[in-house]
From Swiss-Prot:
HAMAP family per UniProt: EF_Ts (MF_00050)
SUPFAM superfamilies: Elongation factor Ts (EF-Ts), dimerisation domain (SSF54713), UBA-like (SSF46934)
Protein name: Elongation factor Ts
Gene coding for it: tsf
Keywords: Cytoplasm, Elongation factor, Protein biosynthesis
Amino acid sequence: MSVSANLVKQLRERTGSGMMECKKALVEVDGDLEAAAELMRKKGLAKADKKADRVAAEGRVVAARSEDGKSGVLVEVNSETDFVGNGDEFRAFAESVAQRALDSKVEDLDSLLASEVDGKSVETLRQEMVAQLGENIEVRRFIRYAGDHQVAQYLHGARIGVMVEVQGGDEQLGRDLAMHIAASSPVCVSPDDVPADQLSSEKEVLLAQARESGKPEEIVEKMVEGRLKKHLSEITLLGQPFVKDPDQTVGDLLKAKGAEVTRFARYEVGEGKEKKDESFADEVMAQVRDS
């Protein structure tokens, strides 16, 4: 049967799919718009399942914060390519997930995926995005802060996001700290927060290096002590030189402002993921196989 251009247009607006896909679905269900939309949804879920094993290591980090500034979230949403990750549809989806994570107050990823936005679960919306954009889309992780202190956030483009909780100080201090964390990548707030096993491992490495000098053991111990102190200042927020004024440490800055950092999180797109090195021809072939 033939279907009207208006019906095809309506289905495209509802599903975000291509004209030929919409026309084919409408023909298959004899022009029933609702049935065509449901058919395309089911086909989209099947496509999502087929794409689930493909590596998604691009995308963006997004943030949302409450009006009073005392709660906030960071969310990483992944795509397979930066082209899709920079697109308007992907950005809108990622931002809606972040807002949902903030509003719903969920504590884990499964609960976030099960929560609803405009009557659809985040997981259903994710699967629809897979069908619409033709790539594996993954809501990878999120973190939520809520308490009595101010939460500051900073996004460096779409690839790095920081959230820091600060007791005392003002809005500008919070933003400066978030920018510093984005640039300097501290592991934790203070030396007391460094895991004991990590500290012990680093000390063993430094000890082995120092002993190669052939110096007496008491000298070696002092060498290790100095190098360990330097290492801790490099990886902890309080010990790092402040990026906007390297003559003072972040710890000195906070002391001068009468403020304290209680916790922070730094997300970078794709960190810890193994990216698949694929040629353009391989990428095209993969898309053909999945179409």
